[in-house]
Amino acid sequence: MSILRAKTSGAQQHEEFRMAFKLSYITGRQDNNVLEVTLAAGQNAVVHATVKNTGTEALNLLKYGTLFDSAPVQKVDVYEGENAVPFKGILRSIQRTDLAPEVFHTLAAGETFETTFNAAEVHDLSSTNYTFIAEGTIPVAPVGSTKISDTIFFKSNTLTIPVDGAAAQSMAKAIPASIDRRTILQSGCSTTQKTQTTQALSYCAQLARAASTAASSGSATKFSEYFKTTAAATRSVVAARLSAVASQCSSLTSGSTTYYCTDIYNYCSSNVLAYTIPSTNEIVNCPLYYSALPTLSGTCHAQDRATTSLHEFTHAPATYSPGTADNGYGYSAAVALTSAKAVLNADSYALYANAIYVGC
């Protein structure tokens, strides 16, 4: 169940790891193996990342949720032993059409992009050795266009860094632990926002319930299309997560997640529909959620408010733990994931729920 709300008013420098794996086009272009990503250690939890276009053509890469993104997104996965360290930044739902030019980064042939970030800003780190790896997908459009035409899968080298916990914990977090939560939806959101959000969450609950049932006892072929396995254990996890989403979408006044209809953290930039703060279990709708999406779509794999909300609820660990990540945006990227990645990919759930509803 969810509460809907609105806002009122020095370790040693380490040797660089040069070995890297190259990124490859999922859809099998002739010019695959065109990007090379390398992680290197800085002071304490600081990571230097380089992305090099080793191909012969420029690449027009979507920034959101990648190493090109300036926001506190999940740029690397962090592990303590075999256990993933929870991410405490933001996860955003992105409009897949009518994208703005500024949400892309063009990387010329032979060009290298460099970025440096402190993993302690979005992870709680103690004094131990941590493993860092950058892995995921990047949507790509033709140069001069903003229409997504392909997806790139990437995996960097593995980097191990001994972290000074006291120094890491003194680092200011990108997202504060809590914020003032004074105004609930009914007294803060506009009438139109309240109506549209209420309708969307009602459909979200219906779609999640139907998809949960399908995951448990529906077509194995359809399930495998989105989650790349028919294993009973995986079907059970997917069904349970979707059932939990249905519960969250079923209430506007109570529960373990908090839902806002205004941009309380100021991350509603171009083409962002909504975002989730996993560490605080807060979900925020952006203006585009209301202006660019229908409440519910009857088109296969199209975006709407209901499935966007469903997508966001899977991110929140209070809905079902662990929360999902953004391992692949859109149908082509989502169905190219491994089963292990798909079961933790928010869009896989939204796309599957849409497919069960529409009959894709």
Curated annotation (Swiss-Prot):
Q: What is its main location?
A: secreted
GO biological process: what's one of them? proteolysis
Residues with attached carbohydrate:
129
Q: Which Pfam families match?
A: Peptidase_M35
Source organism superkingdom: Eukaryota
Q: Under the GO molecular function aspect, what terms does this record hold?
A: metal ion binding; metalloendopeptidase activity
- What is the disulfide pattern of this chain? 189-261, 268-286
Catalyses: Preferential cleavage of bonds with hydrophobic residues in P1'. Also 3-Asn-|-Gln-4 and 8-Gly-|-Ser-9 bonds in insulin B chain
Question: What is its EC class?
Answer: hydrolase
Where in or outside the cell?
Answer: Secreted
Q: Its Enzyme Commission number?
A: 3.4.24.39
Q: Which cofactor does it need?
A: Zn(2+)
Q: Which residues form the active site?
A: 312
Q: Which CDD domains match?
A: M35_deuterolysin_like (cd11008)
**Residues annotated to bind Zn(2+):** 311, 315, 326
Q: List keywords of the entry alphabetically.
A: Cleavage on pair of basic residues, Disulfide bond, Glycoprotein, Hydrolase, Metal-binding, Metalloprotease, Protease, Secreted, Signal, Zinc, Zymogen
How does the cofactor attach, per the note? Binds 1 zinc ion per subunit.
Q: Does the keyword Signal apply?
A: yes
Question: Record's GO cellular component, any one?
Answer: extracellular region
Q: Which PROSITE patterns would you find in this protein's record?
A: ZINC_PROTEASE
- Family according to the record: Belongs to the peptidase M35 family.
Q: What does this protein do?
A: Secreted metalloproteinase that allows assimilation of proteinaceous substrates. Shows high activities on basic nuclear substrates such as histone and protamine.
Q: Which protein are we looking at? A: Neutral protease 2 homolog SS1G_13741
